[in-house]
Amino acid sequence: MTIRVFMVDDHALVRAGMRMILSGETDIEVVGEAESGEAALPLIRKLRPDVVLCDLHLPGVSGLEVTERVVRGKHARVIVVSVLEDGPMPRKLIEAGASGYVGKGGDSTELLRAVRDVARGKRYLAAGIAQKLALSGLDGSQSPFDELSPRELEIAMLLVQGLRQEDIARKLSLSPKTVNTHKSRLFAKLGIEDNIALARLASQYGLLDPALVL
């Protein structure tokens, strides 16, 4: 049985690299790709792939939101491919329904194993990520962002990137009032009062790629 894969990444070179790796396998077929969450979601609904490889940091709708929507609609299983291997994001993506999480620094063997395992209904975490998740539970170390819901965490990410509440509401198809409620709750949970404090905390705990923090 051929595993049908759809790729979502805003970098054409990354998509080309993954396509080259996947296309060399007789049991895997790349059925489509997109450079944004907005473009990907209707194509995923139409093409019905078995596995979606999704970047975390996408323009507009984030990888977290893509994961939630794809899983909620039962359109495919999702593997998140990200440069972030530390901080709360791997755990949050798994909580949001992702079936796998691999780092962009991994090799082709790891990517292929992730695709095959997830297509068979298993969960796959890159070894380094799985170890960090296990150790974070064993040594009692916690990030304040662990207390946030997946939606609150996504809104925190967008706030750190400099988006206004109105922009976030439009991107996530939420009302401005709902976004404001989530913002108030996440600020209270984190013990902060403004976006500057949020950006500092996010950078400290690995919530975002430091290059994205204003």
Label every model-predicted segment.
Residues 14, 59, 86:
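The feature encodes the CheY-like receiver
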Residues 33-51:
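Acidic, metal-coordinating helix/loop segments flanking the phosphotransfer/catalytic sites
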Residues 36-39, 62-65, 85:
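Acidic catalytic/metal-coordinating carboxylates
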Residues 42, 64-75:
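Short amphipathic alpha-helix used as the core "switch/output" element in two-component signaling
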Residues 50, 56-57:
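The short loop immediately C-terminal to the conserved phospho-acceptor aspartate in CheY-like receiver
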Residues 55, 82:
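Active-site residues of response regulator receiver
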Residues 88-95, 99-156, 196, 204-210:
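Short, flexible helix-to-coil linker/hinge segments that flank and couple to helix-turn-helix
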Residues 164-197:
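Recognition helix of helix-turn-helix DNA-binding domains
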